[in-house]
Amino acid sequence: MKIWTSEHVFDHPWETVTTAAMQKYPNPMNPSVVGVDVLDRHVDPSGKLHSHRLLSTEWGLPSIVKSLIGAARTKTYVQEHSVVDPVTRTMELKSTNISFTNMVSVDERLTYKPHLQDPEKTVLTQEALITVKGVSLSSYLEGLMASTISSNASKGREAMEWVIHKLNAEIEELAASARGSIRTPMAAAAALVDK
């Protein structure tokens, strides 16, 4: 068993980061996630948003793993459960693989909270528990997978910044469009007054 942990601070408010987290896939930084299906989404009586999603991924495999399972690429599935609590301003996301569970299990937990000293920033805490089963090289493979998770976490943070930039651009575009819509009738009204 291998445990991997990481912490990252986003220079964006919690609301922005959690919005981006829900729209993170697909993104060009991690093309291995090829599909996201929302299986269930509801708001409970206390106002928490619960989501259950299925992520479809496609991976190129290290040569040692290829020899074990006899494939160069493989499609895998991950189930993800998240809870967004707008009152406490926390988002907790838990994911686990549902493919190849007889060989490996990866249980990941991400928590997004406002930074204690600067509420305009958001702290992401990540942890993963990796267990390779029934293989004599399990500790080597667990280390290899931890390294892959670390690399993917970095790509995930880049993807979050990409989504946030995209969301901000969409908001600016909508605002500019709204300003233009308001000016056009006002300009027409002003022209009528001038006549």
UniProtKB/Swiss-Prot annotation:
PRELI/MSF1 domain segment(s): 1-172
InterPro entries linked to this entry: PRELI/MSF1_dom, Slowmo/Ups
Superkingdom: Eukaryota
Name of a matching Pfam family: PRELI
Cellular compartments per GO CC: mitochondrial intermembrane space; mitochondrion
Phosphoserine PTM positions: S46, S51
Keywords: Phosphoprotein
Family as reported in the entry's similarity comment: Belongs to the slowmo family.
Annotated protein name in UniProt: PRELI domain containing protein 3B
Lineage: Eukaryota, Metazoa, Chordata, Craniata, Vertebrata
Gene coding for it: Prelid3b
